[in-house]
A protein has these predicted regions:
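Active-site loop immediately N-terminal to the catalytic Tyr-X3-Lys motif
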Residues: 18, 53, 68-74, 96, ...
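Alpha-helical segment proximal to the catalytic Tyr-Lys
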Residues: 45, 92-93, 157
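Residue(s) in the substrate-gating loop at a strand-loop-helix junction
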Residues: 63
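Short, small/polar-rich loop/turn modules that mediate ligand/substrate recognition or access, typified
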Residues: 55, 95, 100, 159-161
């Protein structure tokens, strides 16, 4: 095993934090955070034993929402912030092993999950999210995937314990 990518996510909420249900909170953290933890528990030992010692890659998808509060999505913000913290802690634990751990924080990307988010806000069109990004368009999934692939490759060997913002300028 050379690389492991944690990319599972779910959208829940769409209401103020004080109205967020325990179920919504639990779903966000179970899938978005515990999923990363479970992959790390399984994949990191294999990365440490990998075919190319001292060169494994662990990448987790966070979100631009980890770095900027979003209206009525505080629980989602918190879950994605937890992913960033988990990756930073993992990178520290991997110090000196040659295995890196990084997070990618995409902005609004043209996916089914963004469509679900639009539905939470009763928006008729996901393109309304494009205005939050300096590129003034939605990201394409393949743009985010290219960032992840780069982080899984040798040319990113000096990148660990940090976040790569593939967010179209959302967090600028």
């Amino acid at each position: 095993v050379h690389a492991a990518v944690a990319a599972a996510a779910v959208m829940a909420g769409g209401r103020p934090l004080w109205e967020t249900t325990d179920t919504e909170w639990d779903v966000l953290f179970e899938i978005g955070v515990r999923g990363v933890l479970n992959l790390a528990r399984t994949a990191v030992p294999a990365l440490l034993r990998g075919a190319q010692p001292r060169s494994g890659r662990f990448v987790a998808l966070a979100s631009a929402a980890a770095h900027r509060g979003l209206w009525h999505l505080a629980a989602y913000n918190a879950a994605k912030h937890a992913v960033v913290g988990l990756v930073r802690g993992l990178a520290t634990d991997l110090r000196g092993t040659g295995v890196t751990a990084t997070a990618v924080s995409p902005g609004s990307t043209s996916t089914a999950m963004l469509a679900a988010t639009a539905a939470l806000y009763d928006l008729p069109d996901v393109d309304e999210f494009a205005g939050y990004q300096l590129l003034d368009r939605l990201l394409r999934p393949e743009e985010v995937a290219a960032t992840v692939c780069w982080l899984c490759g040798e040319s990113s060997s000096a990148i660990t314990g940090t976040v790569v913002h593939a967010d179209g300028g959302f967090t600028a």
